[in-house]
Amino acid sequence: MSVSNSASPSSLSYRDAGVDIEAGDALVDRIKPFAKRTMRPEVLGGIGGFGALFELSKKFKEPVLVSGTDGVGTKLKLAFQLNKHDTVGQDLVAMSVNDILVQGAEPLFFLDYFACGKLDVDTAADVVKGIAHGCELAGCALIGGETAEMPSMYPEGEYDLAGFAVGAVEKADIIDGSKIVPGDVVLGLASSGAHSNGYSLVRKIIEVAKPDLDADFHGRTFRDVVMEPTRIYVKPLLALMQAMPGVVKGMAHITGGGITENVPRILRDELTARIDAASWTLPPLFQWLQQAGNVDTQEMYRVFNCGIGMAVVVAADVADAVAAQLTAAGETVYRIGRIDSRKDGEAQTIVA
């Protein structure tokens, strides 16, 4: 196909098309120190290769790799609205590492994907700094990632995130809920806030109620409370499993679907979990959301974590010792329920 000279533009560059290679290079330079702090001895090489290399430790005898991927959901919309980008990186890490943790896996490494229409180096650096902090909290290496600048794909000032975590567990130590029996106890570990789920409803309630986001809310601004990053439970629970091998029968990361839809994921069909809603106090953020949005109580437990970010199932005779160990590690622990035999037609998790 020929092009007439009169129609030929002056020499075009990638920058003319909306992609700034120099900005990408500047971002890599900014984030290298953050990533370096997360490195583990098993990491071979550094950032910048076509693939990231990780040598599985010889401490594993019969390792099983466990992988997870997730995003941050519409909590990002609030981050854009509030111009607050320093916490969503931790959210991204937490969603994946907490998921693989529940099967007994130690998170080993993490990769991120950051996509935008126009790369803002400061914003992206804030996000990746949060990702690196989350990796430090989880003890895993930020081993690589991808920054995709795609003109016209995203509105100005917006971006999307995806995270990928890989961990390992000894085959004999996989936690799958198969050992849970009637009489077992459900312990609840406190959440830090709404974590990264239910934010479509959070945003709708904020839109309707129009709160002052900078007003005092129990000693903090409302914006800081609603953007509080997801708690990462990895180190306390791995320490528990090492100190008391075999005591954890099942764990449920309370994410999308809330308590009522996540606890059943670790229960056999013939079991049900009876959760006592009076065993912990609904945190102020959830009280406000329920009141401001006139949200039905059961809907609250189906959408939000309602103050419980991780459920841990153990035998009744070790429940106090497990709770004490987790409390000593800095967790707030509640005895929130028990496991019973399931009756015909009964839900697998009942919050009452």
Curated annotation (Swiss-Prot):
It catalyses: 2-formamido-N(1)-(5-O-phospho-beta-D-ribosyl)acetamidine + ATP = 5-amino-1-(5-phospho-beta-D-ribosyl)imidazole + ADP + phosphate + H(+). The gene is purM. It comes from the Bacteria. Its main location: cytoplasm. Gene3D superfamilies: PurM-like C-terminal domain, PurM-like, N-terminal domain. Signal peptide: none annotated. GO terms for molecular function: ATP binding; phosphoribosylamine-glycine ligase activity; phosphoribosylformylglycinamidine cyclo-ligase activity. It is found in: Cytoplasm. It is an enzyme of class 6 (ligase). One of its GO terms (biological process) is 'de novo' IMP biosynthetic process. InterPro entries: PurM-like_C_dom, PurM-like_C_sf, PurM-like_N, PurM-like_N_sf, PurM_cligase. Transmembrane segments: none annotated. SUPFAM superfamilies: PurM C-terminal domain-like, PurM N-terminal domain-like. It comes from Azoarcus sp. (strain BH72). This is Phosphoribosylformylglycinamidine cyclo-ligase. Its EC number is 6.3.3.1. One of its GO terms (cellular component) is cytosol. Keywords: ATP-binding, Cytoplasm, Ligase, Nucleotide-binding, Purine biosynthesis. Belongs to the AIR synthase family. Pathway: Purine metabolism; IMP biosynthesis via de novo pathway; 5-amino-1-(5-phospho-D-ribosyl)imidazole from N(2)-formyl-N(1)-(5-phospho-D-ribosyl)glycinamide: step 2/2.
